[in-house]
Amino acid sequence: AGIYLYFVFLLPGETYTEPTARRWLFAGCAAVAALVLYLGFPRLGWTRSGLLAALTLAALHRLAIFLPEISTTPWSLGWSEGSRFYNASLFFSRSRYGVAAPTPVLHPTRYLLQSIPFLLSDLPLWFHRLWQVLLWLTAAFASGSLLAMRLRRRGAALSGTVPVLALAAWSFIFLMQGPVYYHLLVIPLLLLWGVQTNRFWRT
């Protein structure tokens, strides 16, 4: 995994920016990782070792994409980054700007989640960027993990920790394809965590 991430994200030049080269590199590194898993845990078998290696590598790739977004640069990392942080700050407009400004009408849940760091004063810009990255990652991975645990409780063929982690990783990758925004996962998270047919009031 480390070799793959180095060649894709750290190696100078554009050798592995071409999709075909990147696919071959991914397949080769996944095959080596699958072999290591199979030799270390023969009970997994070739199929599970291969799937687990590919899922792990893909999840790490998706995680690594977020690292440049935790930047200390004062310049905007995207055309709407500044407005998103400003909209988030409006939930605390009186303490920040001395006036009671209206809260955002568009995507209020997103900006409410992003506003949490504004509870603390004088946090640097990189912390707000880190917080947004954590929202992306935790919402997607928590959704996958809760889904896997729910299926396991309902008697699905998810015996052991490895299948649960594999399903959680696959769900994380699936949700990040779009990606599905973290504020849209709040309700699925509540449903996956809270709904239990044998606990009426909690449900």
Labelled PLM ranges:
Residues 9-15, 129, 162-185:
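Aromatic- and kink-enriched transmembrane "portal" helix at the membrane-lumen/periplasm boundary
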